[in-house]
Amino acid sequence: PMGVVRPIRGSLKPTTEIFVCEMGARHVGDIKEICDMVHPEHGVITSIGPQHLETFFNMENIQKTKFELADALPEGGMLFFNGDNDYIQQQAASPEYDQTPEKIFYNSETEGTGYCAKDVKVSQLGTEFTVVTPDGESERFQMRLIGAHNVSNVVWAIAVAHKMGLTLQ
């Protein structure tokens, strides 16, 4: 939690409109604790995997902990899910999350399920791809990061910005 508290206390100004932070966890309840401090309006669940099994003991505890973010969002909030991650898809489909704020999926290449990246091309100069929105709008993007594995992180950032009112351009 201190990794989130420091920038809030030291860097945020009264004019700050959007604050993005990573909520890391090593134990069940860690994300809930951070959510209780920052009261997020929207959230992104980027990955669920076998990290920190020594403290979580099983995958169900990791899933439960990551979805503490979903439990903390207010009515009208948006929750972005990585549609490429099987653990996230499984948990998001659970009946207990039917009443979750708006669910928005993003993924690397599966069109029609949310925001996705198509025509990914990697070169020595970087990576290019086209983002397609759920309503079919599309835009080509270039980044200096090399590797298709970086595309998913950029797609979620684009999805969040777009859903908050920015254009794809």
Model-predicted segments: where are they?
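ATP-dependent carboxylate-amine ligase catalytic core
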Residues: P1-E68, V151
